[in-house]
């Protein structure tokens, strides 16, 4: 029996009650008299998350998130799926099962995300059907290939049909989509979107029946702009390990209240709303629901005192109470990047100057813009211009085909050195940004030797964070990974970076489904026109 002030997410009122638990579920809730200082609320649900972005395997993620009140998450494992296919999804499900946290998964709908890049796997409609029938899979994952949906592509529509035939939701991904095209997209069966960046976008999509997720992660932080727009869910999407140490859904709730969202509404956005949409048994304190709840000090600060899952205490004042198992060992995915001459990173041009397209990054946003710049040409090679903050960027196919594409990027601020990563959404090829090709190649070689991860290089010095699980995740705990990641960011700042999250920003330069100008292993890509762009032909 647990007693206290409870928040009823059905009615929105708070009253003293005792909760009777039997067999891991709530048996009865009885109103009582008494004065209680704390508030008992349902455990938090992160309704849209890519665990891989934390660089932690699910069992390590759970140990870090549960003390912050997160009892459940709906994870789209399309990062590891792009590297390892269905085997990668199975690894995530198996490792998640070793924790008390209730992980649910969506079947990755876009593996690969587009046909304009090289990925490590392909999941067809038949593979989607197989995944949707797994017990912990609750939806079809975000349908990023919105042009194919709008065009009625047979393969894409077969995946959507597989989910709808099983009465499962289909998550969306429709940045800046509007008008008739948005109507076609929603009419195909897409029910959610987490890519909104303005109140006007939220309003249009909600009017058409979409449920909107306000995203507040480590790279994309849209909650402040969307707080007054009337969103349905609060989600993290992508969260770094250092940020996870500071908070998860509890921190997002604090920000939501700071930005003007009613506290009870905010709690509903991370409990009953996602529970009802995805058909979960957690998310409310009522008979028949899972006995998953959090004791907090107030509905403003959301300081988590205790966490219960299935009626059992799992965290107390920030301390995880469950002894961690060794997790599930994943087969490593080696980096198949053949050795290459450094000249392959160069961009050739005739004359003394070249006019080029440049990717312009926006700090805290996944959307990029396109700039046009005139750069010097020396010995037939187009040069970076650190005085204008225009650096080189290259993407190297990591799956053995030998593709290398190069371009230019603005906004990183590096004055020396290079940074590189095998975390490069969504195909997770190897991406590198730098001042000169020699150091860029050195960064690539270090990652090849490490088996994947993140690296920053300057002269003879470097910092590396190894990510041996598919080149995406560590099998260490959050403290170890956060410390290594913090060292990398500090070193990168010393190289001149002015971004709040340079590695996260770099990892999205190759995401060919978020506007506007991106780069994959086959070249520059115009997301809105959904086509490869020539670097120098305007």
UniProtKB/Swiss-Prot annotation:
Biological source species: Methanothermobacter thermautotrophicus (strain ATCC 29096 / DSM 1053 / JCM 10044 / NBRC 100330 / Delta H)
One GO biological process term: adenine catabolic process
EC number per UniProt: 3.5.4.2
Similarity field: Belongs to the metallo-dependent hydrolases superfamily. Adenine deaminase family.
Sorted UniProt keywords: Hydrolase, Manganese
Enzyme class: hydrolase
Pfam hit, one: Amidohydro_1
Tagged with keyword Ribosomal protein: no
Signal sequence range: none
Database matches in InterPro entries: Adenine_deam, Adenine_deam_C, Amidohydro-rel, Metal-dep_hydrolase_composite, Metal_Hydrolase
Designated name of the protein: Adenine deaminase
Keyword check for Hydrolase: yes
Gene3D superfamilies in alphabetical order: Metal-dependent hydrolases, Urease, subunit C, domain 1
GO MF term set: adenine deaminase activity
Known cofactor(s): Mn(2+)
Catalytic activity: adenine + H2O + H(+) = hypoxanthine + NH4(+)
């Amino acid at each position: 029996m647990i007693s206290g002030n409870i928040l009823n997410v059905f009615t929105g009122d708070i009253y003293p009650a005792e909760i009777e638990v039997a067999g891991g579920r709530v048996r009865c809730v009885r109103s009582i008299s008494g004065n209680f200082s704390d508030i008992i609320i349902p455990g938090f649900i992160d309704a849209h998350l890519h665990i891989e972005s934390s660089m932690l395997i699910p069992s390590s993620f759970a140990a870090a998130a549960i003390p912050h009140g997160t009892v459940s998450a709906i994870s789209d494992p399309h990062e590891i799926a792009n590297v390892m296919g269905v085997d990668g999804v199975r690894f995530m499900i198996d490792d998640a099962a070793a924790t008390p946290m209730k992980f649910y998964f969506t079947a990755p709908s876009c593996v690969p995300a587009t046909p304009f890049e090289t990925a490590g796997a392909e999941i067809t409609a038949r593979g989607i059907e197989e995944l949707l029938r797994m017990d912990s899979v609750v939806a079809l994952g975000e349908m990023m290939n919105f042009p194919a949906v709008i065009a009625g592509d047979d393969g894409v529509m077969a995946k959507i049909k597989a989910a709808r035939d099983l009465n499962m939701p289909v998550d969306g991904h429709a940045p800046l989509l509007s008008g008739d095209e948005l109507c076609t997209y929603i009419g195909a069966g897409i029910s959610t979107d987490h890519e909104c960046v303005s109140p006007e976008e939220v309003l249009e999509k909600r009017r058409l029946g979409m449920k909107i997720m306000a995203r507040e992660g480590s790279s994309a932080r849209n909650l402040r702009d969307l707080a007054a727009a009337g969103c349905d869910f609060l989600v993290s999407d992508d969260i770094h390990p250092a940020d996870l140490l500071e908070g998860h859904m509890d921190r997002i709730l604090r920000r939501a209240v700071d930005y003007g969202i009613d506290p009870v509404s905010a709690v509903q956005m991370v409990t009953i709303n996602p529970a009802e949409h995805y058909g979960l048994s957690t998310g409310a304190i009522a008979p028949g629901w899972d006995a998953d709840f959090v004791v907090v000090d107030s509905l403003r600060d959301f300081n988590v005192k205790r966490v219960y899952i299935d009626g059992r205490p799992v965290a107390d004042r920030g301390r995880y109470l469950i002894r961690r198992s060794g997790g599930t060992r994943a087969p490593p995915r080696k980096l198949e990047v053949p050795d290459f001459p450094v000249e392959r990173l160069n961009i050739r041009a005739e004359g003394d100057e070249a006019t080029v397209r440049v990717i312009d990054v926006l700090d805290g946003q996944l959307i990029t813009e396109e700039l046009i710049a005139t750069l010097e040409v020396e010995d037939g090679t187009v040069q970076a211009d650190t005085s204008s903050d225009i650096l080189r960027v290259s993407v190297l196919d990591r799956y053995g085909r030998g593709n290398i594409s190069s371009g230019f990027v603005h906004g990183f601020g590096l004055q020396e050195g290079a940074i590189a990563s095998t975390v490069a959404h969504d195909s997770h090829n190897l991406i590198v940004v730098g001042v000169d090709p020699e150091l860029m190649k050195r960064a690539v070689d270090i990652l090849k030797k490490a088996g994947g991860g993140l690296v920053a290089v300057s002269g003879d010095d470097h910092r590396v964070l190894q990510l041996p699980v598919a080149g995406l995740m560590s099998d260490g705990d959050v403290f170890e990974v956060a410390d290594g990641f913090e060292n990398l960011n500090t070193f990168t700042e010393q190289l001149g970076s002015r971004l709040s999250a340079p590695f996260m920003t770099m990892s999205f330069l190759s995401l060919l489904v978020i506007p506007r100008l991106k780069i994959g292993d086959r070249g520059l890509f115009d997301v809105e026109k959904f086509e490869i762009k020539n670097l120098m032909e305007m």
